[in-house]
Structures are given as structure tokens and as C-alpha cells.
UniProtKB/Swiss-Prot annotation:
One of its GO terms (molecular function) is (R,S)-4-hydroxy-2-oxoglutarate aldolase activity. Catalyzes the condensation of (S)-aspartate-beta-semialdehyde [(S)-ASA] and pyruvate to 4-hydroxy-tetrahydrodipicolinate (HTPA). PANTHER family: 4-HYDROXY-2-OXOGLUTARATE ALDOLASE, MITOCHONDRIAL, DIHYDRODIPICOLINATE SYNTHASE. This is 4-hydroxy-tetrahydrodipicolinate synthase. It comes from Rickettsia bellii (strain OSU 85-389). It is found in: Cytoplasm.
């Protein structure tokens, strides 16, 4: 099975207008990513406010994204839920639509044991036939995979990657030392992506690449082509943007940045609220300093 989880993967925002999906804006956003030659996109993940969508909106968003992309790059659907049956349903609907893979985090709020986390993913795996990227994001879920659970899950044939949005930079080395199969490790934090790659990572699932996909793609390419100095130069240039995108809860700052660049409205769904004036000013200054052209 081809491993689609590598390189630069953009976690796409979901644009709204008058509290409805703005599908015209979605097309502009996706074409911007495709023109920058990103390796794949994630739809309806954390950055895409997936948990704030109705099931009908989720289906419409995925179908529209799949139609726009039209097989030019892989489309990965966020299928996370704290209800295993619902996660299976999201994966089943995604499969019908024709996505290329899933990104799934452990169930939030319920605080399952490691045994429960394993069974949750095993059930989704057995009910589907597409590749899965595990998504470690303990700051949101309240639980995380242990190394032992990752090792156990990696033995399931279609679990091919781990997106790690934690801060344990020793983890890639530990995992690589005990897992025999190809399990691609991707960083979920833009600001840590180079350090993560240095420990065995193969790419980044990025928020910042919504805004500047060409630079983010160039950074990953330079690193993997052993141009460490070039990659570090881009990383240092983008570091203020990385930091600004998390001064408030993601995706609040990135949604404003995309509005400022002219892609969409600044609408974001409750319980999230739009960026403060201080954050807006910071984002505007950074975008201006980067001379981003769209």
C-alpha cells in the first residue's frame, strides 16, 4: 500500500459565510495549495473545525474538496470522534466519497485506557480499507498513545503513519528503534518540524502552510535534500508566523490570516471566537514582512 503520509501536508481551514460552508472560498484555498505542490491536504481536522460541523456539512465539505482536487493530490479526512461508532461512520462516509486516507486522534474527554484506545482504532481499522494516520494531540484529547500502544497499533496493516503534535522530541527515535514496518512519523507542530525531522520524521502536517505553502514546501524539500542550512534559513524566517498562529486557540489566528489574504471571511464557529485586535495586528505585520503573494 502506497504511503501517502509524507512531506508537506496542509491541515486546511474550513471557510464559512453566513454560518454556512463557503464552497467557493474552499476552491480558492485548495487551488492555492495544489499550485504550491503540497503533498496532501487534511479536510475537517482540528484546523478545519471538524468537530463543529454537522454530519451533512462534513459530507458536503469532503465531497466538494474531493471534486475540486480531482486526484491531483491525496485528500485525507479527519475522522476523529469520542464515539467509536461515530468514528466508523465518518470513515465509512469518507470512503464512499473517495478520500485517500484518514487522520484520527484518540477519543477525547472520556479518558480511555491504553487498551480502550487500541480497541477504538482496531475497530475503525477493521471496518475500513483505507490507510490511517494516527494523530497524537494530547493538549486537545487529554490522553495520548504510549510508545507500546503505537507499536501494537503499527502491526495493523493499514496504520501507516503517526502525526505527533506533542513536544517529546525523543519519541521518533524511540519508535523507530522498536518498529520494524514503515511507519511514517510527521510533526504536528510547525515550529518543531525541523527538530522532529532530525529525529527521524518524514514531514509535517502544517497549519502555517495554509498561508505560505510554497515556503513550507521548500523548507521540507531542502531538509530532505540535505540542505540543512537552507531549511534552517526558511525556518527562522517563518518562526514568528509559527508562534503567532498559536497565540490563541488554533484555528482562530490562521482563519484571520486567510481572511486578511483575501481567501475567505473571518467567520469561525462557537465556542471559538474571532481573533483579538492584538492578534490581528500581529498577523498582519508578519504577513507583510513575509511579502506573501497570492
Amino acid at each position: 500500500m502506497n504511503n501517502i503520509f509524507k512531506g508537506l501536508i496542509t491541515a486546511i481551514i474550513t471557510p464559512f459565510r453566513d454560518n454556512k460552508l463557503d464552497l467557493n472560498a474552499l476552491e480558492k484555498i485548495l487551488e492555492y495549495q495544489i499550485n504550491a505542490e503540497v503533498n496532501a491536504v487534511v479536510i475537517a481536522g482540528s484546523t478545519g473545525e471538524g468537530s463543529s460541523l454537522s454530519f451533512e456539512e462534513y459530507k458536503l465539505l469532503l465531497q466538494t474538496a474531493k471534486d475540486i482536487v480531482n486526484k491531483r493530490i491525496p485528500v485525507i479526512s479527519g475522522c476523529s470522534s469520542n464515539n467509536t461508532a461515530c468514528a466508523i461512520e465518518l470513515a465509512a462516509e469518507s470512503t464512499k466519497i473517495g478520500v485517500d486516507g484518514f487522520m484520527i486522534s484518540p477519543p477525547s474527554y472520556l479518558k480511555p485506557t491504553q487498551g480502550g484506545i487500541y480497541k477504538h482504532f482496531e475497530a475503525i481499522h477493521e471496518a475500513s480499507n483505507l490507510p490511517i494516520m494516527l494523530y497524537s494531540v494530547p493538549s486537545r484529547t487529554g490522553v495520548d498513545f504510549t510508545d507500546e500502544t503505537i507499536l501494537k497499533l503499527s502491526k495493523l496493516s493499514r496504520i501507516l503513519a503517526l502525526k505527533d503534535a506533542g513536544i517529546d522530541l525523543e519519541r521518533p527515535l524511540r519508535i523507530k528503534s522498536v518498529i520494524n514496518k514503515e511507519l511514517n512519523l510527521l510533526c504536528g507542530n510547525d515550529d518543531l518540524s525541523l527538530a522532529f525531522n532530525a529525529q527521524g520524521g518524514v514531514g509535517c502536517v502544517s497549519v502555517a502552510s495554509n498561508i505560505t505553502p510554497k515556503l513550507c514546501k521548500e523548507l521540507q524539500e531542502k531538509w530532505h535534500n540535505n540542505d540543512v542550512k537552507g531549511a534552517l534559513g526558511i525556518h527562522q524566517r517563518l518562526l514568528p508566523l509559527y508562534k503567532a498562529l498559536f497565540v490563541e486557540s488554533n484555528p482562530i489566528p490562521v482563519k484571520y490570516a486567510m481572511y486578511y489574504l483575501g481567501f475567505c471571511t473571518n467567520e469561525i464557529r462557537l465556542p471559538l471566537t474571532e481573533a483579538t485586535d492584538t492578534t490581528k495586528k500581529q498577523i498582519e505585520e508578519i504577513i507583510t514582512s513575509l511579502s506573501i503573494k497570492v
